[in-house]
């Protein structure tokens, strides 16, 4: 690590601690030439995840899209913002832990529905109706029957 004051390349670590919700390490360093101290951050490089959409186009994974869809499905239901964000974070973590570089949107949708089913059945049916593109009342009834099993 190059010293920002004298550009010397060698330093020693004086202090090290977790930062940013344990996603980074904050280090205090001391330059071995000028003895000035400075802070550096070490962070794991995120691997970009691409979502394969139904039309086979690809776009970057965006947790905010999951949150937005959940907010719509859970509108006027007893589901808190914290629960919605927890679902989105769990799904993001699940995808990251599997080291997936590409993931089908269908897989994400199924994970969302699995989580919603346990939290609020009405929100589940709302989300399913958009996600599975229900065309008529019979499709709704089939989904509700499956939910009641």
From Swiss-Prot:
InterPro entries tied to this protein: ATP-cone_dom, NrdR-like_N, RNR_NrdR-like
GO MF annotation list = ATP binding; DNA binding; zinc ion binding
Query: Would the keyword Repressor turn up in this protein's UniProt record?
Result: yes
Q: Which domain of life is it from?
A: Bacteria
Tell me where in this chain the ATP-cone domain is found: 49-139
**Keywords, A to Z?**
ATP-binding, DNA-binding, Metal-binding, Nucleotide-binding, Repressor, Transcription, Transcription regulation, Zinc, Zinc-finger
Q: Does the keyword Membrane apply?
A: no
* Cofactor(s) listed: Zn(2+)
Q: Tell me any Pfam family this protein matches.
A: Zn_ribbon_NrdR
What is the UniProt remark on how the cofactor binds and its stoichiometry?
Binds 1 zinc ion.
Which residues constitute the signal peptide according to the record?
Answer: none
Name the GO terms of the biological process aspect: negative regulation of DNA-templated transcription
- Segments forming unnamed zinc fingers: 3-34
Primary role? Negatively regulates transcription of bacterial ribonucleotide reductase nrd genes and operons by binding to NrdR-boxes.
Similarity comment text for this entry? Belongs to the NrdR family.
Q: State what protein this is by name.
A: Transcriptional repressor NrdR
- Tell me the organism: Clostridium perfringens (strain SM101 / Type A)
Per the UniProt record, the lineage of the source organism begins with: Bacteria, Bacillati, Bacillota, Clostridia, Eubacteriales
Name of the coding gene: nrdR
């Amino acid at each position: 690590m190059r010293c920002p004051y004298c550009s010397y390349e060698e330093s020693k670590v004086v202090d090290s601690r977790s930062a940013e919700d344990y996603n980074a390490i904050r280090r205090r360093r001391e330059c071995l030439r000028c003895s000035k101290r400075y802070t550096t951050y070490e962070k794991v490089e995120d691997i970009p995840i691409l979502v394969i959409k139904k039309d086979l186009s690809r776009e970057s994974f965006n947790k905010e899209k999951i949150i937005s869809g959940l907010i719509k499905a859970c509108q006027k239901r007893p589901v808190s913002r914290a629960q919605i964000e927890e679902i989105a974070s769990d799904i993001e973590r699940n995808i990251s832990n599997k080291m997936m570089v590409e993931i089908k949107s269908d897989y994400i949708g199924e994970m969302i529905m699995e989580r919603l089913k346990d939290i609020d059945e009405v929100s589940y049916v709302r989300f399913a109706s958009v996600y599975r593109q229900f065309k008529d009342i019979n499709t709704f009834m089939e989904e509700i029957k499956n939910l009641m099993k």
